[in-house]
């Protein structure tokens, strides 16, 4: 495993984070959201790669390289990087990378050039009817020092600040209707708890049209009849209470991104 690179100079970062790259201020903590690419901000890209590698290694993953930067970050038509910047501490709190569906290119076989293309099969219906109004998200991270264990409000709202950025994308790109991407659960996560989350998601968020299907489906190791008996309620909210209780009993938590995505879908679908 390679050593992670040293932090990039704050002066180099500030020189690249210019006004035209600033998307907006965050709703909380007075942080700033920027959009950059490896081409227009190479030093910032290196710092993102450094911070991603540190955060992912701490969670049981990581590339093992000195920076988490791949071909999708640096290709001719690169993914854009959405980052939250703390102007007081002059450091990056977290980020996502993304690509707009209308910017996606296709290879000689007609397959989309996407970071998730080696994991999923995309139906013709998805490519035709959904991709043009979709943003693919990936590589989400919160810098280690700003994760939820940090006591001050800057750390407390780091994830909220990222949501601000995603919301702002839909304002500046009003044709966008959907986000999609993968969520990583590392092998160290409790297997029975993982199965409960997976069963719950399949029950309440099934892709009935098979818009996107995994090349290697994740198989349940637990007895499916037992899971069906456990999650026997008619509503998401009642089953969710059971799920949350079961995961906590095992000494774990529902992964924050899984939790946030599920709850955001429910809030969107509920009438106001």
Where are these regions (language model features)?
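A short helix-loop-beta-strand connector motif used in the catalytic cores of GNAT acetyltransferases and
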Residues: 72-83, 106, 269
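Short, well-ordered loop/turn elements at secondary-structure boundaries
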Residues: 76-80, 88, 92-93, 130-132, ...
């Amino acid at each position: 495993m390679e050593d992670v690179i040293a932090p990039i100079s704050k002066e180099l970062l500030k020189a690249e984070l210019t006004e035209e790259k600033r998307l907006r201020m965050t709703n909380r903590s007075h942080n700033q959201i920027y959009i950059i690419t490896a081409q227009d901000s190479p030093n910032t890209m290196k710092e993102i790669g450094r911070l991603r590698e540190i955060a992912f290694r701490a969670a049981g993953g990581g590339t093992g390289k000195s920076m988490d930067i791949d071909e999708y970050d640096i290709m001719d038509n690169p993914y854009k990087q959405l980052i939250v910047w703390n102007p007081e501490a002059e450091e990056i709190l977290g980020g996502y990378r993304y690509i707009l569906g209308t910017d996606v290119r296709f290879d000689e076989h007609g397959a989309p050039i996407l970071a998730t293309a080696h994991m999923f099969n995309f139906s013709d219906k998805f490519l035709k009817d959904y991709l043009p109004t979709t943003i693919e998200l990936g590589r989400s991270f919160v810098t280690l020092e700003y994760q939820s264990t940090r006591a001050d409000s800057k750390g407390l709202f780091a994830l909220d600040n990222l949501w601000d950025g995603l919301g702002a994308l839909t304002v500046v790109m009003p044709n966008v209707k959907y986000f999609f991407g993968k969520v990583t659960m590392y092998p160290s996560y409790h297997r029975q708890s993982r199965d409960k989350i997976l069963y719950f998601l399949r029950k309440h968020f099934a892709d009935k049209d098979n818009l996107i299907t995994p090349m290697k489906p994740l198989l349940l190791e637990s007895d499916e009849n037992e899971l069906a008996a456990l999650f026997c309620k008619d509503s998401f909210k009642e089953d969710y209470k059971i799920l949350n209780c079961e995961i906590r009993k095992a000494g774990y938590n529902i992964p924050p991104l899984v939790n946030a995505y599920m709850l955001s879908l429910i809030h969107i679908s509920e009438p106001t």
